[in-house]
UniProtKB/Swiss-Prot annotation:
Job of this protein: Catalyzes the transfer of the AMP portion of ATP to flavin mononucleotide (FMN) to produce flavin adenine dinucleotide (FAD) coenzyme.
Organism: Halobacterium salinarum (strain ATCC 700922 / JCM 11081 / NRC-1) (Halobacterium halobium)
Xref: Pfam families: CTP_transf_like
Lineage start: Archaea, Methanobacteriati, Methanobacteriota, Stenosarchaea group, Halobacteria
Required cofactor names: a divalent metal cation
Subunit structure: Homodimer.
Family in the record: Belongs to the archaeal FAD synthase family.
GO MF term (any one): ATP binding
Name of the molecule in the record: FAD synthase
A biological process term (GO) from this entry: FMN metabolic process
SUPFAM superfamilies referenced in this protein's UniProt entry, alphabetically: Nucleotidylyl transferase
Enzyme class, first EC level, given as a word: transferase
Pathway: Cofactor biosynthesis; FAD biosynthesis; FAD from FMN: step 1/1
Length: 146
């Protein structure tokens, strides 16, 4: 059985998230998803939704076999516990694949690191960004300052 890990924030689920998870699931037989804890999201605005709610929504998606919230201090701890064959990175995620491979090797994990394919918008007003969804909600409600 080929175990695949996908990871991310998964705040305000959109078609890009679904595509990423479908692509990741196609890389193996069992898809594990690790959701970044709110306090660990430092490269963008923190998630709007709580950790458990984001996990529960992701767990309900068809391609996902298991979903868990990441470790508060060591982002590789859940990966060690899962012992995957593949880590699937989102096509636009900021992660350095070579650095991940080096850390996996240092921890004795034999795991491939692959990038998911991009998902292009299928129609003019399709929104493929959680931040863009939040901005659109605020703009349509006339409140640009949360």
């Amino acid at each position: 059985m080929t175990r695949v890990v996908a990871q991310g924030t998964f705040d305000l689920i959109h078609p890009g998230h679904v595509h990423y998870l479908e692509d990741a699931a196609a890389m193996g037989d069992e898809l594990h998803v690790i959701l970044a804890r709110r306090e660990n999201v430092t490269h963008k605005d923190p998630p709007v939704l709580p950790n458990r709610q984001r996990r529960d929504v992701v767990a309900a998606l068809d391609p996902v076999d298991h979903a868990r919230i990441g470790h508060p201090e060591d982002i590789f701890a859940p990966i060690e516990a899962i012992d995957p064959d593949v880590i699937a990175l989102g096509f636009d995620q900021h992660h350095d694949a070579a650095a991940i491979e080096a850390e996996l090797a240092d921890r004795g994990l034999d795991c491939a690191v692959e990038r998911a394919s991009p998902r292009e918008a299928r129609y003019d007003d399709e929104v493929l960004s959680s931040g863009d969804i939040a901005d659109r909600v605020l703009a349509q409600r006339g409140d640009s300052d949360p």
